[in-house]
UniProtKB/Swiss-Prot annotation:
Topology term for the membrane: Peripheral membrane protein
An individual GO BP term: positive regulation of translation
Name of the protein in its database record: Elongation factor 4
Disulfide-bonded cysteines: none
Enzyme class, broadest EC rank: hydrolase
UniProt xrefs under NCBIfam families: lepA, small_GTP
Catalytic reaction(s) noted: GTP + H2O = GDP + phosphate + H(+)
Principal subcellular localization: membrane
Organism expressing this protein natively: Paracidovorax citrulli (strain AAC00-1)
UniProt xrefs under InterPro entries: EF-4, EFG_III/V, EFG_V-like, G_TR_CS, LepA_C_sf, LepA_CTD, LepA_IV, P-loop_NTPase
């Protein structure tokens, strides 16, 4: 075990994490030259395109150090985005060390800070590395100062490197061998292994990536999950060098995969502990207690997904089920809307997660989707004291039956150059933010706010980028549910509620939002042969109204001169026809209308 080193790489998007991983793999001969491609560890197309890492991947590397010993280095790739923070914490808890990769030309960013704090909380040794030193605008001294200021770890011997040219790679490997502690764990205790990640493979079923903490697992042994108690046979074991390499046993301190013919990803939850099923003469039996830190992931943001053609409902369901095989944090359930027909209510970890799921549905499964405005989960206390969770605005009970509504509050860390503090604070205050803290680190400022999650999901991130010219970065974590004066605004077309257009907003903004949505609808819905009234209402109170005037045929065109009574007769006839039409006519709501809710602000 003394020759094993488990480490991961923490970096902000675009700071060169995947490229650095490629270099380390290449240096240790993990893949032959012909198998090397850019971003070896990012296996999904969308990961390579957006340059982000979503699922954890690993590589077991063999490195012959300068002291002549051969070390087994396990690189565990972590997702860098805040939506996937639970996956990050699981990846990090499987490591003893982490390389903090900072772009020497840009300095530290908010998400790096968030992941770095997670690592320090878990007791992981953090080693700073300055990447992109080949760029002419690299400023290593400033980057070091920022690391010390913001994160508070000593950066005097941070290693300068360039993943692109390969400079400094050997120094990084030596640093890992010297500074990262060997795995703590007891090879002679009962088996305990933590699931870092799991994904679905069409040939063998679920593949689990595990870090063995205590004991060992042999091929063919029966093991069980401690959270669910389900037991399976360890059919195949092995390690990734990124290509997979079968083994007969996984020992304490190692990171490897287990294939056990599991059909559903839900059975292999990330963060769960694996132990042996029962005591046999040749083993030590099951462990007493599970490894700490496991929690069920709760979706934070909900949206409705509907197929554009009603006949494609089944394909959409199949597509979602297939996605769920590889993404256990995606929740969905069938939902019916009067306006959009049959579809699904889906739960996501955050906005990036939602975008990625939508994009994968459209790209990998050829789905045409209508998406409703994202909403968050509210805790509603009804008149009789019963507490229900409402994640869909159209399911909100009537005002009269509600005692109070509690909305989710998150703690947000905003990180930006000091000249943008003013606009960012104005934005946070508009969104009902409460400032908790403000700290200067050199030229950078870190603001801490409490904000309602409902205000963030619509457009906060885009606005933040625009008021700070793209320099501000943010991350958020859930804090609590808090009572708040929020109301449901319904949109009515000719007196009929359109359920998919309902929104939940704070009372202080309800009139403004109602007017804005009504005005937007007026632009989008095409003119009919009769008047269309668009109204925004809270309960029975109408708070805004717009009217789309009817198109009129000129029925008087063929009367040249003539008596006024003749003209009046034709006009009355037209009026009667319009009135009848209005009673039976229905208004088509185009797809853009559902997206318009998101862009009301502009």
């Amino acid at each position: 075990m003394n020759h094993i080193r488990n480490f991961s790489i923490i970096a902000h998007i675009d700071h060169g994490k995947s490229t650095l991983a490629d270099r380390l793999i290449q240096r240790c001969g993990g893949l032959e030259e012909r198998q090397m491609e850019a971003q070896v560890l990012d296996s999904m197309d969308i990961e390579k395109e957006r340059g982000i890492t979503i699922k954890a991947q690993t590589a077991a590397l063999q490195y012959k150090a300068r002291d002549g010993q051969v070390y087994n280095l396990n690189l565990i790739d972590t997702p860098g985005h805040v939506d996937f923070s639970y996956e990050v914490s699981r990846s990090l808890s499987a490591c003893e060390g982490a390389l903090l990769v900072v772009d020497a030309s840009q300095g530290v960013e908010a998400q790096t800070v968030a992941n770095c704090y997670t690592a320090l909380d878990l007791g992981v040794e953090v080693l700073p590395v300055l990447n992109k030193m080949d760029l002419p605008q690299a400023d290593p001294d400033n980057a070091k100062a920022e690391i010390e200021d913001v994160i508070g770890i000593d950066a005097t011997d941070a290693i300068p490197c360039s993943a692109k040219t390969g400079m400094g790679i050997d120094e990084i490997l030596e640093l890992i061998v010297a500074k990262v502690p060997a795995p703590r764990g007891n090879p002679d205790a009962p088996l305990r292994a933590m699931i870092i990640d799991s994904w679905f493979d069409p040939y063998v079923g679920v593949v689990m990536l595990v870090r063995v903490v205590d004991g060992r697992l042999l091929k063919g042994e029966r093991f069980k999950m401690m959270a669910s108690g389900a037991a399976y046979n360890a059919d195949n074991l092995g390690v990734f060098t990124p290509a997979n390499e079968p083994r007969n046993a996984l020992n304490a301190g190692e990171v490897g995969y287990i294939i056990a013919g599991i059909k559903e990803l839900k059975a292999a939850k990330v963060g769960d502990t694996i132990t042996l099923e029962k005591k046999l003469p040749n083993n030590l039996g099951p462990a007493e207690q599970a490894l700490p830190g496991f929690k069920e992931i709760q979706p934070q943001v909900f949206a409705g997904l509907y197929p554009t053609e009603a006949s494609e409902y089944d394909q959409l369901r199949d597509a979602l089920e297939k996605l769920q095989l590889n993404d256990a944090s995606l929740h969905f359930e069938p939902e019916v809307s009067q306006a959009l027909g049959f579809g699904f209510r889906c739960g996501f970890l955050g906005l990036l997660h939602m975008e990625i799921v939508q994009e994968r549905l459209e790209r990998e499964f050829d789905q045409d989707l209508i998406t409703t405005a994202p909403s968050v989960v509210y805790e509603v206390v009804k008149g009789d004291g019963e507490v229900i969770m409402v994640e869909n605005p159209s399911k909100m009970p009537d005002q009269g039956r509600i005692q109070e509504i509690r909305e989710p509050i998150v703690t947000v860390h905003l990180y930006m150059p000091q000249e943008y503090v003013g606009p960012v604070m104005t934005l946070a205050n508009q969104k009902r933010g409460v400032q908790l803290n403000m700290a200067y680190h050199g030229r950078q400022v870190m603001l801490t706010y409490e904000l309602p999650l409902g205000e963030i999901v619509l457009d906060f991130f885009d606005k933040l980028k625009s008021v700070s010219r793209g320099y501000a970065s943010m991350d958020y974590e859930f804090k609590e549910y808090r009572a708040s004066d929020v109301v449901k605004v319904d949109i009515l077309l000719n007196g009929e509620k359109v359920d998919a257009l309902s929104i939940i907003v704070h009372r202080s903004q309800s009139a403004y939002r109602g007017r804005a949505v009504a005005a937007k609808m007026r632009e989008i819905i095409s003119r009919q042969m009769f008047d269309v009234a668009i109204q925004a209402a809270i309960g029975a109170n109408i708070i805004a109204r717009e009217t789309i005037k009817a198109l009129r045929k000129n029925v008087l065109a063929k009367c040249y001169g003539g008596d006024i009574t003749r003209k009046r007769k034709l006009l009355e006839k037209q009026k009667a026809g319009k009135k009848r039409m209005k009673q039976i006519g229905s208004v088509e709501v185009p797809q853009e209308a559902f997206l318009a809710i998101l862009q009301v602000e502009e």
